[in-house]
Amino acid sequence: MLRVNIVGIGPGNPKLLTGAALEAINQSTILIGDKRMLANFASEKRFYDTIKTAEICNICANANPEKDIVSILVSGDVGFFSLAKTISGKLPDCECVRFCGISSLVYFAQQLQMSWDDAKIISMHGRRQNFIEAVAHNEKVFALTGGENSPQALCAKLCRFGLGGVQVYVGENLSYDNENISSMKAKEAAQKQFSSLSVMMIINKDAKTLAHNVHGLNDDLFMRSKVPMTKQEIRAVSISKLMPQETDVIYDIGAGTGSCSIELALQAKRGMVYAFERNPEAVQLIEKNKELFGVENLTVIAGEASEKLEEMPVPDCVFIGGSGGNLCKMLDTIYAKNVNCRVVINAITVETLIEVVEYYKQHESYALDIVNVFAARAKKLGAYNLMMSQNPVYIMTALKKGE
């Protein structure tokens, strides 16, 4: 069986290699990694300049188990947002051994003379993360950057969400001769250019504890206008029925003020919410509430939802607060994308109730649950409190039978 070492080389400077990692590299006949990593090692070995999984697997398949030892060099530590996880799962016929390295987080914290055990850690390098939420609700955030998520781009995003005053430390080319560490406000960093090999530490002294952990936020927390809004009590029941998961792709059709969209985005922190709305005034309001709550995992889709659904990503669950008269057509499109999609439909008219019931009579593989919610709020009138009723709402939940 071919021996494959997966070696964490730290931030890059060979002086920071562990003794065990250096020994594993020295014993190897084949080294695989990018050009920057390979440059520090002896030329008598066979070098392969690649970090593509398919190419690495092919090299290992053609190696001689009797003569060769392969070392795959990965940056940082093998357990910290590393290629090691992907590679080891693709080499079942090899003996894979991991060697730890110094991660960029550990090295950068050392250079800043700062502890890191209290930091929120996120990777923006080829990943989708709710960066704004992390910074808004954590005093210290460490971020790996890369690609379109450069330090300047991330700081520009902070500025758009009202966080331009947070303190930012940027570490460029860590451990190399041209290492540079700078400190400034996010609004200043947004105007600068940084190396493609950069990490960030963000300090937000005004971080707010994330209290949005229940369904049914107070209506007064949202920016409002004459645009219809799903009230707190109805929202609480509807979202509970929808059962959003942290990584879900969610549609909110007929989003109105965006109150449901906001709550869903807060629940699906590592997912994405698409708010469909045809009213231009409501579209602007959703954008304002998006900025107010700092939910960047919310995308507003302006126009008729029935005309937009085909091009959208596959949904895990869908909330329909308004259909524009195209309810059955939209449900057909949704189920064509995902037959197991969880669907919650709110209605205030008997006609919509009948339409939904008739639809699911024709689609017997789904179980339809109907709840009619009556809510009333107290209103002060002199020395008395009068209960003022809201419109009753039918909350209809459709789940695939057996789910």
List the model feature ranges, each with a label.
Residues 1-99, 106, 270-273, 277, ...:
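Class I S-adenosyl-L-methionine
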Residues 2-8, 19, 50, 68-70, ...:
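A contiguous loop/helix-start segment that scaffolds small-molecule binding in enzyme catalytic cores
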Residues 13, 76-138, 306, 364-386, ...:
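Class I SAM-dependent methyltransferase SAM-binding "motif I" and its flanking Rossmann-like core
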Residues 247-256:
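Conserved class I S-adenosyl-L-methionine
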Residues 257-269:
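Conserved SAM-binding loop of SAM-dependent methyltransferases across substrates and taxa
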Residues 266-273, 337-339:
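Conserved S-adenosyl-L-methionine
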Residues 286-287:
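Conserved SAM-binding loop
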Residues 335-389:
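C-terminal substrate-binding/active-site "lid" region of AdoMet-derived donor-dependent transferases
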